[in-house]
UniProtKB/Swiss-Prot annotation:
Cofactor(s) listed: Mg(2+)
Main location: cytoplasm
Presence of keyword Cytoplasm: yes
Binding site for Mg(2+): D47, D86, E118
Gene name linked to the record: panB
Native source organism of the sequence: Thermosynechococcus vestitus (strain NIES-2133 / IAM M-273 / BP-1)
Record protein name field: 3-methyl-2-oxobutanoate hydroxymethyltransferase
Sequence positions that bind 3-methyl-2-oxobutanoate: D47, S48, D86, K116
GO molecular function terms noted in the UniProt entry: 3-methyl-2-oxobutanoate hydroxymethyltransferase activity; magnesium ion binding
Lineage: Bacteria, Bacillati, Cyanobacteriota, Cyanophyceae, Acaryochloridales
EC number: 2.1.2.11
Any single GO BP term: pantothenate biosynthetic process
Spans through the membrane: none
Length: 261
């Protein structure tokens, strides 16, 4: 069977069809090629690459130029998956026009197909409208917002009070009204995610938000056992970190003992 490229209308249609959307992150050509070959629906060049690939403690130091650099590498490894890229911290919060310039660079220079912004503030809502008007698809993101980690006091679950839950629901509805094609629900109670999913016509993609979303996303390094610390909501499907260290140790020993080459 010939595999076709994933399109935005196909992703949105999956909600009505009851077909869960799969999404994982990539930060270079190697991982993009592997995810694409595995049939992942959506590949996200997340600003989590700041922590996974660049060694920062948070996503905040990542620049737009760095995102473009990594997205260009990912683009070269993608043949079929739909490609989305994060707008990093302070590349869109100033104004809708700043967001348009930043997103435009990702579209033109890295050939991504959509961008993601965090939160549902008035500026983000206005920026979403501006980007959609310009023909740039936007993925929303509510709940735990990594770009606000200091403001939130860490990587804690959000939406645990009635007021916070109502604000997250209102934010998701506002983003849908502004024109996002889907919304990520990060680290919120499963019941809240279920409520949001039921009220939205667009797909919801969960990360630590329970089983009721229209799709799921995780950081690939967490899935493959490559992260030193894995979030409590993630599942490790392979321990590649341990296997890689063992393989490298075997290589070094073989060289030192002159068993290789």
């Amino acid at each position: 069977m010939v595999r076709r490229s994933v399109t935005l209308p196909q992703l949105q249609a999956k909600k009505a069809l009851g077909e869960p959307i799969t999404m994982l992150t990539a930060w270079d050509y190697l991982w993009a090629r592997l995810l694409d070959a595995a049939g992942v629906d959506v590949i996200l060049v997340g600003d989590s690459l700041g922590m996974v690939a660049l060694g920062y403690p948070t996503t905040l130091p990542v620049t737009l130029d760095q995102m473009i650099h990594h997205a260009q590498a990912v683009r070269r490894g993608v043949s079929h998956s739909f490609l989305v890229c994060d707008l990093p911290f302070l590349s869109y919060q100033e104004s809708p026009e700043q967001a348009l310039r930043s997103a435009g660079r990702l579209i033109k220079e890295a050939e991504v197909q959509a961008v993601k912004m965090e939160g549902a503030s008035p500026v983000v809502q206005a920026a979403t409208r501006r980007l959609v008007e310009a023909g740039i698809p936007v993925l929303g993101h509510v709940g735990l917002l990594p770009q606000r980690v200091h403001q939130l006091g860490g990587w804690r679950q959000q939406g645990n009070t009635p007021q916070d839950a109502a604000a997250i629901l209102a934010g998701a509805l506002a983003l849908a009204e502004a024109g996002v094609f889907a919304v990520i629900l990060e680290h919120i109670p499963a019941a809240l995610a279920q409520q949001i999913t039921a009220q939205l016509k667009i797909p919801t993609i969960g990360i630590g938000a329970g089983p009721h979303c229209d799709g799921q996303v995780l950081v690939t390094a967490d899935v493959l056992g490559l992260s030193p610390q894995v979030p409590p909501f993630a599942k490790v499907y392979a321990d590649l970190g341990t296997q890689a260290i063992a393989a490298i140790e075997n290589y070094c020993q073989a060289v030192k003992s002159r068993q290789f080459p």
